[in-house]
Amino acid sequence: IFFFCLMASLYSQARPISYPEGFTLMSHSDIYKDSVYFHYSPSFKYSVGLEIAKDDYFDDEYSFFRFTYLLNRKNTQNSQSNLYFQLGLDPENFDRHFYGLHGDWETRRWFVGFGYKESFNDIEDFSEKYLQFGIAPYLGKYGDLHTWLMIKTKKNSLGDSWSTYPVIKFFKGDFLIELGYNNKTRTDAHLMYRF
């Protein structure tokens, strides 16, 4: 059970850190930007990588060197929690950078996650925050297709209010897909593949 809980938690979020010496390719798309992020994890404690983004809000394209560090992980017999620090720096414009925290707690059945990020650029600084709650409608075995039904609420300070919407997440093996939608924020999509 402990091993499955550990594996489930590794896949429940688009993982900012992979297995030691592992690689991860992630893609994210929402109303503000589309991005692709590739990272390498020298250890389970941190990852380094490159994100390439097409910013729809500022009509710009840029990249970030990224660093993510696992501040805390707590495993119990029935749950796991993680807290991460993240940092990004544009190599062509040091005024464009970000930092933030995100974390999660989960069992095989329940999930709670949060994130907060401060972003800086030449045009307008902004913050992003979210809360996410989920339930697994069934408990699969290791290697099965797993499903999370979730509610996500998020706010970008460039917008005017919180947006809350349903999200469905599937993962199997080293592949994860997460899709959410509402008429305010449109599509919120995450893809991940680890190798």
Residue ranges and their predicted role:
Residues 13-151, 163, 167-195:
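Transmembrane beta-barrel domains of bacterial outer-membrane proteins
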